[in-house]
């Protein structure tokens, strides 16, 4: 989803930031980089998979590849320039075809971050990370492919479009489906 000027994309993050995340302001920077997905892809996923879900907190945790006992409470949609977005994967260009291979990584800050995130994801936490640019859906369903994931290293260029508590976000998605 692009803004009217065609310069920014609308991404979505699920979080527990203390900041109220008011529309018009930047996404808070206290949590480090922003892990996000496409609002358009989330909306399409909801249209196809919403039936039968009784615990949305758990289902979103599974879909987005985060622990089921996390404290995620709100979804925030935000505008950002594609130039400020990378793919948290072997190849960082979010517009290029994804290729699998550690050898693609060049020495430097991103490779250092990548290596630290592997250690953190697989040895220090319960956050599965595919390293392929998509979330790991651990629901046990038909596919382990969740949604395309993006990383915004610096929130300074973001502009919040909306913030909804998880239950209200589900209602918002339902309204979008009824409008379609």
Q: For each predicted feature, which ranges?
A:
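Short active-site loop/helix that positions an aromatic residue
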Residues: 39-57, 61
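ADP-ribose/NAD+-binding catalytic cleft of ART/PARP-like enzymes
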Residues: 1-36
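Surface-exposed beta-strand edges and their flanking turn/coil or helix-capping segments
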Residues: 24-26, 49-52, 90-93
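Short His-Asn-centered micro-motif
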Residues: 35-39, 79-81
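Solvent-exposed loop/turn segments at secondary-structure junctions
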Residues: 17, 41-42, 83-86
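Low-complexity, intrinsically disordered regions enriched in charged/polar residues
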Residues: 36, 54-57, 144, 163
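Histidine (H) residue identity feature
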Residues: 15, 49-50, 78
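Conserved NAD+-utilizing ADP-ribose enzyme module
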Residues: 61-180
